[in-house]
């Protein structure tokens, strides 16, 4: 339906393809890896029928959006989401993320706050990395990062976490 420019690379615009349908309270659907905004086509009709304004977009590097050589980190994804919300002048927004999209929502809230948001939904969410590291200086100490999680869960999650880390 349209594009939103979120930056430039080598004097070329970085554009995100988006679709904006319906009216009412806006709900922004954020796809997972390696999908695009079309992955929500099964949910969109019901949301439109329920009276929502439904916005989907292809994250940079996915679908019909630009494929720049940089910017594939959650800070940039969150900033791109912020540009989408600002450009479309969205308020009282419901953000729904699937898989990788949940990390984008979490980072968005951390970087840009909740002023534009009414609700968020995390579907098939990524496990957060809680421990303090060089690239996560605000995390919890290692003695606390897993303190509320049963050791058997951590043991069975390690292969999944390792796989997810390698994919992203």
Predicted region positions:
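Structural signature of beta-strand start/N-cap positions in the alpha/beta core
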Residues: 26, 51-53, 91-94, 116-119
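Gly/Ala-rich beta-loop-alpha elbow adjacent to hydrolase catalytic centers
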Residues: 97, 101, 105
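Conserved acidic catalytic loop of the alpha/beta-hydrolase fold
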Residues: 75-93
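Flexible "cap/lid" loop of the alpha/beta hydrolase fold
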Residues: 106-155
